[in-house]
């Protein structure tokens, strides 16, 4: 908005835009600290599912396409499969750094 113009598309008073709180729909899917903490503890206690162990083994043997196909078969969609592959790859990398 232009400052105090009387005519034209930008006519009107100069205003400061209201600072509205964030909508809950904008936060959807964002992981909270508590949820992340609980999931990490569950992962520590329960370990990996059998299909996850198999996928990790395939990734280690550089059979990425086969791993992606297996994950897609088990999880239903390619998007979920890619996310799982990414997660398991980071787990493998962190375990390599630990040793």
UniProtKB/Swiss-Prot annotation:
Tell me the Pfam families matching this sequence: Ribosomal_L36e (PF01158)
Its GO CC terms?
cytosol; cytosolic large ribosomal subunit; preribosome
Where in or outside the cell it occurs: the entry states: Cytoplasm
What terms describe the molecular function in GO for this protein? structural constituent of ribosome
Question: Keyword annotations for this protein?
Answer: Cytoplasm, Ribonucleoprotein, Ribosomal protein
Q: Where is this region: Disordered?
A: 1-32
User: What InterPro entries does the entry give?
Assistant: Ribosomal_eL36, Ribosomal_eL36_sf
Q: What is its main location?
A: cytoplasm
What the protein does? Component of the ribosome, a large ribonucleoprotein complex responsible for the synthesis of proteins in the cell. The small ribosomal subunit (SSU) binds messenger RNAs (mRNAs) and translates the encoded message by selecting cognate aminoacyl-transfer RNA (tRNA) molecules. The large subunit (LSU) contains the ribosomal catalytic site termed the peptidyl transferase center (PTC), which catalyzes the formation of peptide bonds, thereby polymerizing the amino acids delivered by tRNAs into a polypeptide chain.
* Protein family per UniProt: Belongs to the eukaryotic ribosomal protein eL36 family.
Assembly state and interactors? Component of the large ribosomal subunit (LSU). Mature yeast ribosomes consist of a small (40S) and a large (60S) subunit. The 40S small subunit contains 1 molecule of ribosomal RNA (18S rRNA) and at least 33 different proteins. The large 60S subunit contains 3 rRNA molecules (25S, 5.8S and 5S rRNA) and at least 46 different proteins.
Comment field (misc)? There are 2 genes for eL36 in S.pombe.
What is the name of the protein in this document? Large ribosomal subunit protein eL36B
Q: Which organism is it from?
A: Schizosaccharomyces pombe (strain 972 / ATCC 24843) (Fission yeast)
């Amino acid at each position: 908005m232009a400052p105090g113009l009387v005519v034209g598309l930008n006519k009107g008073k100069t205003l400061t835009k209201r600072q509205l709180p964030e909508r809950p729909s904008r936060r959807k899917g964002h992981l909270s600290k508590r949820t992340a903490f609980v999931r990490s503890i569950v992962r520590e206690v329960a370990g990996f599912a059998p299909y996850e162990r198999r996928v990790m083994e395939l990734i280690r043997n550089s059979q990425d396409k086969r791993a992606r196909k297996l994950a897609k078969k088990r999880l239903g969609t390619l998007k979920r499969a890619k996310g799982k592959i990414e997660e398991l790859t980071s787990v493998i990398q962190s375990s390599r750094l630990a040793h």
